[in-house]
Amino acid sequence: MGQKVHPTGFRLGITQDWKSKWYSEKKKYTQTLHEDIKIRKFIEERYKQAGISSVLIERLGDRMRVKIMAARPGIVIGAKGAEVEKLNEIIKKLTSTKEVIVNVDEVKKPELDAKLVAEDIALQLERRVTHRRAMKKAIDSALKAGAKGIKTQVGGRIGGVDLARKEWFMAGRMPLQTLKADIDYGTARASTKYGILGIKVWIYKGDKLEGKAEEVLSRVEEELHTT
């Protein structure tokens, strides 16, 4: 029986980077991890209309840097940066960190961001758009924006049927077993009249590694397939 691997975790340190970067002593690790979870949850809920793609957190001693990637950064920044200043103070209270720096960057192509695409599909499902139409629209938009491949999946009581099921659509290539493949993965949930629907999106943007790094990775992949 085949085993599923998380697309992001599978490529950490190769084509994907860590969302949290810090070191903590064993006795403080759990507290620090829960602080990161609280920060992300707060930002995603407070700025839901901004289209939050990711929240990157770096810590060094008593300093913390939070980088927010958003489709509509103006909502997070606020008038003359007022909202960012508020967010700084809130994060300090949530974590007891002395110095917090918040940076907000714009997602240039939301159509190629798996999390934003998944959330857009979820929003359409909540507005009673059919799942096939929502998924096909997302696929068309991603391919027009330059995606090499895209796969979308919806699971749950689709259309209000008694038994839960999964439906998916795919266009282009999706090399899930290739480590050098730059595959963005995102999920979302849609609250419908018949219950919760889960949405998953994979977007293949091409290969990232070149030259010697690619040769080394190819040898590693060959060894993995032969063992």
Curated annotation (Swiss-Prot):
Assembly behavior: Part of the 30S ribosomal subunit. Forms a tight complex with proteins S10 and S14.
Q: Which GO terms describe its molecular function?
A: mRNA binding; rRNA binding; structural constituent of ribosome
Superkingdom of the organism of origin: Bacteria
Record keyword Ribonucleoprotein present: yes
Describe its function. Binds the lower part of the 30S subunit head. Binds mRNA in the 70S ribosome, positioning it for translation.
KH type-2 domain ranges (all copies) = 39-108
State the organism of origin: Sulfurihydrogenibium sp. (strain YO3AOP1)
Q: Is Ribosomal protein set as a keyword in this record?
A: yes
* Pfam families cross-referenced by the UniProt entry: KH_2 (PF07650), Ribosomal_S3_C (PF00189)
Identify its protein family: Belongs to the universal ribosomal protein uS3 family.
InterPro entries referenced in this protein's UniProt entry, alphabetically:
KH_dom (IPR004087), KH_dom-like_a/b (IPR015946), KH_dom_type_2 (IPR004044), KH_sf_prok-type (IPR009019), Ribosomal_S3_C_sf (IPR036419), Ribosomal_uS3_bac-typ (IPR005704), Ribosomal_uS3_C (IPR001351), Ribosomal_uS3_CS (IPR018280)
Write the protein's name: Small ribosomal subunit protein uS3
Listed A to Z, the keywords are: Ribonucleoprotein, Ribosomal protein, RNA-binding, rRNA-binding
Q: Which GO terms describe its biological process?
A: translation
CDD domains cross-referenced by the UniProt entry: KH-II_30S_S3
State the GO CC annotations: cytosolic small ribosomal subunit
